[in-house]
């Protein structure tokens, strides 16, 4: 009995010693990790490196960032200020908030900083993508891609975008059950990208299969760049390979079959624009270009669409004010959008609708910020930003802390109205699409899509929350509901009366 007690005490002592050793090892390794990055400061600059934590060896604070969401940024900003250091996705990083700080970074492209996304993002988007190009190559690619988003191009996409949205809302309204808005918004924006932007003629089954692969790709675009079995990065690479194979097949079929087309889609324009600028695009460039177009049109637009629906649910007075504007501009008549009423210029003239979309993008900016690599050491907010480090300028936090916006946490479209124009008080206080020479090329298409969605929601649907409370919002990798946003949609006829489903009609007939 005594020996058994001794064995138990010995085992507990050994376990305690092991735990203490592990804790000491972690503490020492973490301290060495901090010193390793402190040693990278530019010795020729007297300013200190920004305050902050580099987390644990190799992984840094990546898991804190993923698990804490918006609290990660806000807690560190409160502790360290608008400029602080961290270590995310395998790279030392300085996060930057505030209009003046962001302005210096965006205006310093090519001489202070250069675009460089995390390694996983660079590898998965591909070497030929616009996002990964720099210097003269970037300028050339931007000219080629810019025609995709010209006024003429948007006008040609508009009827197709409207049709895709109308068909989707009819499906939502015909479903007697509630729908998961974020999931369905992802399917909607993916369908828009594939069928409208790229003009691919895929069956519903092929579209569904491609969507599943694409989701796996998107989920791992921002992952630790560790290429080992079962890692997110490896899953992303596998999804990219499958996508490129499917895209090559779709592109070849499209190039061979040009019959029955009534408009030039983005892929047509991209091919012709490449020829006009003296360089016919290779198949690899076309595949990378189409993948990037889908990626750009998908996640951020689905995020903003979900935020739009949620805010219209929360603020029915905003929805009614939208309807009044549509009626006043002869777009909405007897509860329906007048045929042929939607033109790009007409939509652009709807001032209140524009305010609503601007406020959605201010309060729920889908993208947290943009990545840059430091080309030469410079000063920011009293700190040195060392050469070779990465910088992430924060869009969302700059919006949240901008002094020009009153009641910053309140959804208030009127702040962008002609009487207030809060966004006019500072160029870099409001930047949902970035800024400088690398501002988002597709911003006008994204806003057009959101406006058409708002118009169609106002005209053909009544919708209500199917749960007792609204879900919490998560900001990583894009703004989205942490739990499902469940909503029931009801179709409306020309008199704004609900259209009953077949089952409801039968039940009504038996009463």
Curated annotation (Swiss-Prot):
Alphabetical list of Pfam families matching this protein: p450
Membrane-related topology note: Peripheral membrane protein
Reactions that this protein is recorded to catalyse: all-trans-retinoate + reduced [NADPH--hemoprotein reductase] + O2 = all-trans-4-hydroxyretinoate + oxidized [NADPH--hemoprotein reductase] + H2O + H(+); all-trans-retinoate + reduced [NADPH--hemoprotein reductase] + O2 = all-trans-18-hydroxyretinoate + oxidized [NADPH--hemoprotein reductase] + H2O + H(+)
UniProt cross-references to CDD domains, sorted A to Z: CYP26B1
GO cellular component assignments: endoplasmic reticulum membrane
InterPro entries: Cyt_P450, Cyt_P450_CS, Cyt_P450_E_grp-IV, Cyt_P450_sf
EC number: 1.14.13.-
Coiled coil: none
GO terms for biological process, alphabetical: retinoic acid catabolic process
Superkingdom assignment: Eukaryota
GO molecular function: all-trans retinoic acid 18-hydroxylase activity; heme binding; iron ion binding; retinoic acid 4-hydroxylase activity
Binding site for heme: 440
Keywords associated with the record: Endoplasmic reticulum, Heme, Iron, Lipid metabolism, Membrane, Metal-binding, Microsome, Monooxygenase, Oxidoreductase
Keyword Endoplasmic reticulum: yes
Essential cofactor(s): heme
Protein localization: Endoplasmic reticulum membrane; Microsome membrane
Function field: A cytochrome P450 monooxygenase involved in the metabolism of retinoates (RAs), the active metabolites of vitamin A, and critical signaling molecules in animals. RAs exist as at least four different isomers: all-trans-RA (atRA), 9-cis-RA, 13-cis-RA, and 9,13-dicis-RA, where atRA is considered to be the biologically active isomer, although 9-cis-RA and 13-cis-RA also have activity.
Family the UniProt entry places it in: Belongs to the cytochrome P450 family.
PANTHER family: CYTOCHROME P450 26, CYTOCHROME P450 26B1
Name under which the protein is recorded: Cytochrome P450 26B1
């Amino acid at each position: 009995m005594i020996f058994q007690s001794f064995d138990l005490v010995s085992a507990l002592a050994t376990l305690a010693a092991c735990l203490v050793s592990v804790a000491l090892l972690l503490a020492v390794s973490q301290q060495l990790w901090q010193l390793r990055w402190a040693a990278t400061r530019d010795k020729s600059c007297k300013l200190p490196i920004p305050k902050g934590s580099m987390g644990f060896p190799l992984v840094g604070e990546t898991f804190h960032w993923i698990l804490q969401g918006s609290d990660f940024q806000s807690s560190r900003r409160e502790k360290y200020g608008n400029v602080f250091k961290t270590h995310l996705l395998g790279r030392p990083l300085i996060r930057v908030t505030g209009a003046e700080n962001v302005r210096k970074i965006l205006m310093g492209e090519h001489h202070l900083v250069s675009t460089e996304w995390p390694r996983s993002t660079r590898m998965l988007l591909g070497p030929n993508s616009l996002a990964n190009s720099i210097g003269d190559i970037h300028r050339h690619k931007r000219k080629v891609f810019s025609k995709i988003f010209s006024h003429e191009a948007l006008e040609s996409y508009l009827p197709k975008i409207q049709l895709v949205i109308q068909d989707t809302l009819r499906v939502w309204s015909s479903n007697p059950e509630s729908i998961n808005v974020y999931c369905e918004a992802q399917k909607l924006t993916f369908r828009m990208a594939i069928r409208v932007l790229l003009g691919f003629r895929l069956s519903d089954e092929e579209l569904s299969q491609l969507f599943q692969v694409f989701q796996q790709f998107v989920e791992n675009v921002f992952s630790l760049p560790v290429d080992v079995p079962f890692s997110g990065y490896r899953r992303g690479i596998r999804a990219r390979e499958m996508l490129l194979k499917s895209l090559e097949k779709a592109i070849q079929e499209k190039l061979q079959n040009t019959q029955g087309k009534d408009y030039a889609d983005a892929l047509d324009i991209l091919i012709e624009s490449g020829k006009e600028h003296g360089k016919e695009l290779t198949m690899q460039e076309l595949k990378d270009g189409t993948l990037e177009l889908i990626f750009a049109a998908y996640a951020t637009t689905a995020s903003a669409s979900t935020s739009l629906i949620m805010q219209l649910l929360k603020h029915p007075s905003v929805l009614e004010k939208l309807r009044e504007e549509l009626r006043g501009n002869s777009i909405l008549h007897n509860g329906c959008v007048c045929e042929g009423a939607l033109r790009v210029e007409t939509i652009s003239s709807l001032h209140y609708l524009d305010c609503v979309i601007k406020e959605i993008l201010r309060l729920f900016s889908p993208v947290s910020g943009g990545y840059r690599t430091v080309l030469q050491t410079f000063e920011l907010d009293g700190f040195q930003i060392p050469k070779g480090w990465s910088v992430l300028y924060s869009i969302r936090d700059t919006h949240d802390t901008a002094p020009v916006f009153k009641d910053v946490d309140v959804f208030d479209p009127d702040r962008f109205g002609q009487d207030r124009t809060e966004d006019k008080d500072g160029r870099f206080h409001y930047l949902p699409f970035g800024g400088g020479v690398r501002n988002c090329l597709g911003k006008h298409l994204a806003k057009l899509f959101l406006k058409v969605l708002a118009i169609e929601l106002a005209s053909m649907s009544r919708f209500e929350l199917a749960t007792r409370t609204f879900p919490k919002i998560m900001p990583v990798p894009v703004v989205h509901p942490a739990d499902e946003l469940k909503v029931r949609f009801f179709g409306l006829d020309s008199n704004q009366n609900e259209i009953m489903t077949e089952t409801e009609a039968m039940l009504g007939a038996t009463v």
